[in-house]
Every structure is written in structure tokens, then in C-alpha cells.
Amino acid sequence: MKNLSIENITRACKGTFHGDESILSQEVSGVVIDSRKVQPGYLFVAIDGERVNAHKFIPDTVKAGAMCVVSHEDLGETDFPYILVESTGQALLDIAKLYRDSFDMKVVGITGSVGKTSTKEMIASVLAQKYHVHKTLGNFNNEWGLPITIFDMPEDTEVAVLEMGVNHFGEMRRLSSVSSPDICVITNIGIAHLEFFKTREGILQEKSQMIQDMKNGGSIILNGDDDLLCKMSPVKGVAPVFFGTGSNCAFRADNIEPQGLRGTSCTITLKDGTSFDCLVPVPGIHMVSNAVAGAAVGYTLGLTASEIKAGIESLPSIPGRNHIIETDHMIILDDCYNANPISMKASIDVLNMAIGRKVAVLGNMGELGDTAEVLHAEVGTYAAQQNVDLVCGIGDLTHALVEEASRGTHTQALWFADNESFIQAIPDILKDGDNVLVKASHGMNFPQIVHALEEL
């Protein structure tokens, strides 16, 4: 870590320093919010969780060698230095902004309803052909995760690819004001988090706030196949550039051919008319859109067509996200990290590419509000339309999903109250050679199911 002195940190978060002022000129060697990760020379920011008051762990961090602590509680006279602030959550963002601005680098900001993480991985894979790239860790994309990602940036970072996720109005500006993106990418406007945003237009309004913090001379890259994004007008005098499959897209994919679970082949045409054939090495036609987004960002940052192609074709597979696992008894399509109605249907499409019996193990989709029952039912109908052989619904919200799936002529549908009930039934319902999709919202803990299937 570099260029973060206690004095500059105090100034950045508008805090009041208490303690030995001789350390004000010293630089911290790390910033953490998890007291268990404190090492000598670190700054600990005490952020209270829903169930835990982080301030009670301050003595432990001091014993572990913390140089200083950021607190929103007045700790009075202490034998260790601390910075008193109004809000430690805001202080974390302010310190992250200070650190981000200490780098001479480009920042790619990514948001959208579906595909943020997979698009982030694709863009990072492309840019890594030319630059030292730092990317969001996993899906650390919220008001705590974004700062953690920024603090972990190596000093030689040339491009940061930062994912930003929101589920309430007002959150995006708090994130984008920290990241200050040079390139803004929006993957799509779906129906995730309707419980809070109410309409797709509300989602668009919040997601597009990222562009307000774009740096001068920046670029806006949007999914031209999205019916709302394709209508966006110039923002801050910058006209959007579109990626997708339509004639309105400056970066376009055609000749799209599924290659089973190997991925999808396509031809990608760049803004200057250059085109190349490539294999997107992750199953699902929807992944082609991510590849074209990667091509658009790569082109904008000066990569050649051959570098872009190499980045797309070397995309690593990530557990929980369209991850193929082959065991002695079955093929598992591990897409269990998260779920919404659009991504559920896309994963069913991927399952349909497999050869042999197809099983969809589907769990609750969260944050759908009053539309939850209808949207779960739609997924069940879709599974039946795609002739999935067996649909297993897990969780209270999947009653409607199972009911609609069971109406399919070729589809058997079973409901389970929880993960344990399903796991106990596995020997009775699955067969050797099955292709098994595992997908649900994050809170359903479906990695537990993936692990159980792997252990068979």
C-alpha cells in the first residue's frame, strides 16, 4: 500500500485525530474492516454490522498492531491513536477515494441488473493482455466491498475493473464518487431488486447515476440490445457507444453458434470494421454479450483485435458462475452464486445444450417484492417449455415454480422445503449421467448442494 498517511486519512474523512501526533506523517500498510485481518501498521475502520458492534473489537486490533483506528464512538482518553468521525461507513468511502486518486490509472466501472460479475471477469481477461489489471474481488461491489477492492490494489495497477451493485436509490452515487470511472459499462436493465426500485425505469435511473461521476473525456458503453439502454441520450456531452447483436451496435457479434458446454462461437466486429472469429469458452449464448462488452472496452483502451480475441478465449471459469464440474456420475452446472428471473432462464438455456437427462435444481429468488410468486411461476413455465426432464424447487418461494413446471408434458417437478431435504433425496431422484443445474439467490447457500453432488 502507498501514499496513505494518518494525516491525509484524517483530512479525507473529516475526522478529529486523538493520540500521539508524531504518527501523523506515518503511512499505514493496509486498511481493513475485519478485526481478524489486522496486521502491524494497519488502519482498522470500525464499521458496525447488523448484529455486531465492531467497536468492541478495537482492543483486539490494538494488540494485533494496528497503527490507528477510525471510530464513530468517542473513545475518550486512550493509550492508542484513533480518528473520531461522524460515520465510519462514510469514512471508509472517503479513505478509498483518497487511495483511488493516488493512482495514475484508468478505471472501468461496471453495473447492471444481470451479468455484472461475469462481464467484469471478461473485461479483466481482455485487458490483462496489455495491462496490469486489478478487478473487484468476487462480487465485493457494495459500499464495503468496493473500498476493500480499492485498498487491495497493487502499486503497479494500470487499469482497475470495478463492479458496482446497488439495491436502493442513492447508493450508486456513493460508489461512483469513489471509483470516478473513466469508462462506464451498463450490462442491462432487468428486474432484479424490484422490491426497492418498483420499475425498470427506476432501476435505469439509479444505475445510470454512475455516469455522473465519469471523468472528463470518459466513455459510456451500453448494451444496445436492451430496450431501455438503447434509448439513452448523451450524458455530460458524451454519446453512448453500444455493444450487442443489433445493427445499432458499434461493437457487434453475429454468426453465433452454440458449441454445447464448450461455449459459443461467434464473429465479433469492432467499431472500425475489423472482425474476428472466436470461441467464448463459457456455456450460454448470453455470455456472447459479455464478450462483446469486453471487446468494446478493450478497443477503447487501445488493444488490438488479436489481443481482444486472446483475452476472450482465455476467460477463466469461476465457481458459482456457469462453472462446469464433471464427476464420475454427472455433469454439474454450478451457477449457484445468485439468481433472478432473467438469469434463471438463461441458465436453463445453458442446461438445454447438454446431451442427456437434464435436471434443474432451483431455489428461491430474493428481493422480488409483490411480484415474487408470478416471477417464480414464470421460471417454472419456462423450464417446462424447454423440456427440462426434472425440476427440483427448494424453498418456500418455489411452490409456484414447481406447480407450473409440473404442467409440462415432459417435465417432472418436485418440491423440497430446504437444502437438507433435497440432499437426502438425491440417491432416489438423480441418475448416473445426469446434467444438473444448481441455481438460486445467494442466501439459499446452494454451494452446500454443489458440494453434496460432488461427493456422490
Question: What is each stretch, according to the model?
Answer:
Residues 72-73, 105-108, 134, 185-191, ...:
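Short beta-strands and strand-loop turn motifs
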Residues 2-109, 118-129, 151, 403, ...:
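Short, basic phosphate-binding NTP loop
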Residues 110, 319-321, 443-451:
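ATP-dependent carboxylate/acyl-activation modules
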Residues 7-11, 91-224, 228-238, 428, ...:
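Phosphate-binding loop of NTP-binding sites
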Residues 12-16, 71, 75-79, 185-332, ...:
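Acidic, Mg2+-coordinating active-site environments of NTP-dependent enzymes
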Residues 58, 62-63, 176-177, 384:
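Non-catalytic positions within long, well-ordered alpha-helices that form the structural scaffold/packing
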Residues 51, 318-320, 336, 340-409:
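Active-site beta-alpha connecting loops in nucleotide-dependent enzymes
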